[in-house]
Amino acid sequence: MSETGQRESVRPSPIFLGLLGLTAVGGALAWLAGETVQPLAYAGVFVMVIAGWLVSLCLHEFGHAFTAWRFGDHDVAVRGYLTLDPRRYSHPMLSLGLPMLFIALGGIGLPGAAVYVHTWFMTTARRTLVSLAGPTVNLALAMLLLAATRLLFDPIHAVLWAGVAFLAFLQLTALVLNLLPIPGLDGYAALEPHLRPETQRALAPAKQFALVFLLVLFLAPTLNGWFFGVVYWLFDLSGVSHRLAAAGSVLARFWSIWF
């Protein structure tokens, strides 16, 4: 690969930069809405949350890819995983469309995108770190957004901060979901290197049913209550009221008022 090609394989893609810009535009609209619930407020929070969530999906997968690259899998650069281009991360519908649908229907940050990294030559500890890198990004984003809300919240711009709080809430749902030891998710991938080879082979077919397991989690009242109990507990540790995130959810999912 030429030097120019190498630079392009790690340079942030125009699409990712466009998503960042769109997030900023949504934030600006929410800021201009002030504290008044009006069409501008719904539009601003919707754009900020959806674009911001896509940005976080790219950063999550970049976390996996960059960690793998640091540990020796330099093919991730060739595959474009270090460009933060959402088109590089698996199937567009399953990786991007499905998470958007889950946000629209239930306000849940579903992990969707995926990068394929080579970890077979890595130590057990490094394989685990590669798997945990993505959820770590979600945790860092949640902490950053909640810290900003806690320190900078101004009732005059309540619409903006409601959207920021909801985006942080989505990061925490993604964190908890990803850490579940369900085959196909990061939590299981972090544990898999520590399992016996025969156990790994026995559980491998279950990875294709990860979405089914998640649907059971969301539809079973007891499991659903446990899941959101953990998410709300983590959210409340920040000192930010989860009612602010609930308000942001209503603004981002404005159709839920009527349906």
Curated annotation (Swiss-Prot):
Active site per database record: E61
Gene: rip2
GO molecular function: metal ion binding; metallopeptidase activity
InterPro entries per the UniProt record, alphabetical: Metallopeptidase_M50B (IPR052348), S2P-M50-like (IPR044537)
Protein name: Putative zinc metalloprotease Rip2
Transmembrane domains' residue ranges: 14-34, 39-59, 97-117, 128-148, 156-176, 211-231
Keywords: Cell membrane, Hydrolase, Membrane, Metal-binding, Metalloprotease, Protease, Transmembrane, Transmembrane helix, Zinc
Compartments (UniProt record): Cell membrane
GO BP term, example: proteolysis
Names of required cofactors: Zn(2+)
Cofactor: how bound: Binds 1 zinc ion per subunit.
List of residues binding Zn(2+): H60, H64
